[in-house]
């Protein structure tokens, strides 16, 4: 069973920001933000045509500065948020803003990758997330499955909850919390949990992971030394409400049960340098992607701590006697965790990896040299999970 070859797209500039177009559930589309100090920065809208295995792209100008983080509205295909750096009074500030892409680009295009970006279009600024009182923005999180009206931004040691009003042209700060303690505390990343009615957020600062209840803006759990070095990224299991994955500069990926945070449930040590990203598959939570500055992307099958530790179980009525016996044998043995594949198409640090929001078997990864790679879960594993 031959697997499809990876598809590679090169941006002209360095890049570290990647997001699927979350509100798009039919077409496979990703947004990539560039980091250039010399030229106008860009957002590339990448459309993947999986029938022909080719990429089509559109380019939007993002003239305000180099993009450190990008996230797409869960409700409106045309809306996105960026964190970008700009220089003012010879100081570099990282700001955040909400943008709208031109209407005709929301649903992609059919321009081939070789067309020049001379016909790049500009983004419409909807609103700034005002951080003058709070410091540098590290990320913007949209309320999962929300109506695209609620956002959280992480600014230095502040967790800020925003309401977007008047067709997203105005961001009103509705609540905030601050990290307190010794030293210069700064959030590095965060994830908004899709569980508990979207009332919980997890954040990383230094080596610690904290859980917050955004109704009271109070801390609900804290994993003090979650990693030996800086925690880079977090993700929630979409099917198990208390399960959280983290990764960091200690080259490890850890899985936590937030009801008992004294020890991780499981630890992976497959990367040889900092791990920048960890992502659960949206449908099949045993599939976990990690990206690292060892220039590799690893796909792991964490089935023992997934929502289906015994694989895909079938109703008794659907089985013949012989199959019944086979099913009983299957039930007795939990499946083994394993590394499914290591993807080595990158030659530089891989700063981002994301699953498609339209196809659960497809993902994109982005390395700092501007190389975007689209890969798929191996077919044999896909059928093993489905059948």
Curated annotation (Swiss-Prot):
Extent of the WD repeats: 132-172, 182-222, 226-266, 270-310, 345-385
User: By its UniProt entry, which InterPro entries does this protein fall under?
Assistant: EIPR1, WD40/YVTN_repeat-like_dom_sf, WD40_repeat_CS, WD40_rpt
Tell me which UniProt keywords the record has, alphabetically: Repeat, WD repeat
Family annotation (SMART domains):
WD40
User: Which biological process terms from the Gene Ontology are attached to this UniProt entry?
Assistant: protein ubiquitination
Which family would the database say this protein is a member of?
Belongs to the WD repeat EIPR1 family.
What name does the UniProt record give this protein? Answer: EARP-interacting protein homolog
């Amino acid at each position: 069973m031959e697997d499809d070859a990876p598809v590679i797209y090169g941006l002209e500039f360095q890049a570290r920001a990647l997001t699927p177009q979350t509100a798009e559930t039919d077409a496979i589309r990703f947004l990539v933000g560039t980091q250039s100090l010399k030229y106008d920065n860009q957002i590339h809208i990448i459309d993947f045509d999986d029938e022909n295995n080719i990429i089509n792209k559109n380019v939007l100008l993002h003239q305000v500065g180099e993009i450190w983080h990008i996230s797409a509205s869960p409700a409106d295909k045309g809306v996105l948020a960026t964190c970008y750096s700009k220089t003012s009074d010879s100081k570099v500030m990282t700001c955040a803003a909400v943008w709208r892409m031109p209407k005709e680009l929301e649903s992609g295009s059919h321009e081939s990758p070789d067309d020049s970006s001379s016909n790049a279009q500009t983004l419409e600024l909807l609103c700034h997330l005002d951080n003058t009182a709070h410091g540098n923005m590290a990320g913007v999180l949209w309320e999962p499955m929300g109506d695209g009206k609620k956002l959280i931004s992480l600014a230095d040691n502040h967790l800020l909850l925003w309401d977007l009003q008047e067709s997203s042209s105005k961001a009103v700060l509705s609540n905030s919390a601050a990290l307190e303690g010794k030293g210069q505390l700064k959030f590095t990343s965060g994830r908004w949990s899709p569980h508990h009615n979207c009332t919980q957020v997890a954040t990383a600062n230094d080596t610690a992971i904290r859980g917050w209840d955004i109704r009271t803006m109070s801390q609900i759990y804290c994993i003090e030394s979650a990693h030996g070095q800086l925690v880079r990224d977090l993700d929630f299991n979409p099917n198990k409400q208390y399960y959280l994955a983290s990764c960091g500069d200690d080259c490890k990926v850890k899985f936590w049960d937030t009801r008992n945070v004294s020890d991780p449930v499981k630890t992976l040590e497959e990367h040889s340098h900092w791990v920048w990203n960890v992502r659960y598959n949206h449908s099949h939570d045993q599939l976990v992607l990690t990206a690292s500055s060892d220039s590799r992307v690893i796909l792991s099958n964490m089935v023992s701590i997934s929502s289906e530790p015994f694989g895909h179980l079938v109703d008794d009525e659907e089985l013949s006697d012989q199959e019944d016996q086979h099913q009983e044998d299957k039930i007795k043995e939990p499946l083994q965790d394993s590394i499914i594949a290591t993807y080595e198409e990158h030659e530089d640090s891989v700063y981002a990896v994301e699953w498609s929001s339209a196809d659960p078997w497809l993902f994109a990864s982005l390395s700092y040299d501007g190389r975007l790679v689209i890969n798929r879960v191996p077919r044999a594993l896909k059928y093993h999970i489905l059948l």
